[in-house]
Regions:
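Structured alpha/beta reader/binder surfaces that contact nucleic acids or chromatin modification marks
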Residues: 1-189
């Protein structure tokens, strides 16, 4: 099943873990997924504290995004007010939200539900993503690409069905697959 892997700063992860933040703000939304879908949470290392309840540099859990709220920011920086009550659950101050999304632009509020947190946070390399041939090595140079030439012709294929390990966290979010090991590693919050 296709999912998202989302990078979230440690201070926001802490609020999510405490149940205080139930909306995550983003400038974009996945076009290939419809709600509900699973979002894995990667706690970023930037400005992180080691003594936090949210372990930096790890996949700390996941949530189900059961609704995406469009956030329209007008040219003057005002946010369309009909959805502000929901957006307050993001814990992002009004002016910061407008600045982040950009004047005259549309952003998105991902509603967080069914939060599950790992007892032992996972390394990013335990995540999987799709290889679309846009990587630096291209398919012909990829370590997962198999090519064989014979008198009857040549044969080539991707040995991993275009699903590869994630090697670095996403800037914001990326598509991933529900292949992260979960054996007794989750608790329900």
């Amino acid at each position: 099943m296709r999912c998202l892997l989302m990078s979230i700063k440690q201070n926001w992860c802490e609020l999510i873990l405490k149940g205080e933040k139930t909306i995550e703000i983003r400038k974009s939304r996945p076009q290939e997924l419809s709600t509900p879908f699973k979002c894995y949470i990667y706690c970023t290392k930037t400005g992180a504290k080691e003594d936090s309840i949210a372990k930096p540099g790890k996949v700390i859990g996941y949530f189900i995004c059961d609704k995406i709220i469009p956030i329209r920011v007008f040219e003057d920086g005002l946010i369309q007010d009909w959805n502000w009550n929901s957006l307050e659950k993001s814990k992002v101050p009004y002016d910061d939200m407008a600045t982040y999304i950009g004047h005259g632009k549309i952003g998105y509020g991902y509603q967080i539900s069914n939060l599950k947190i790992y007892k032992e946070p996972l390394d990013i390399t335990e995540s999987k993503t799709i290889c679309n041939g846009d990587c630096d090595s291209k398919c012909e140079k990829c370590k997962y690409y198999y090519y064989e030439s014979s008198e009857d012709g040549s044969y080539a294929e991707c040995m991993v069905n275009n699903i590869i390990d994630v090697t670095r966290p996403p800037q914001s979010w990326m598509y991933t697959y529900e292949e992260i090991p979960r054996n007794d590693k989750t608790i329900i919050i």
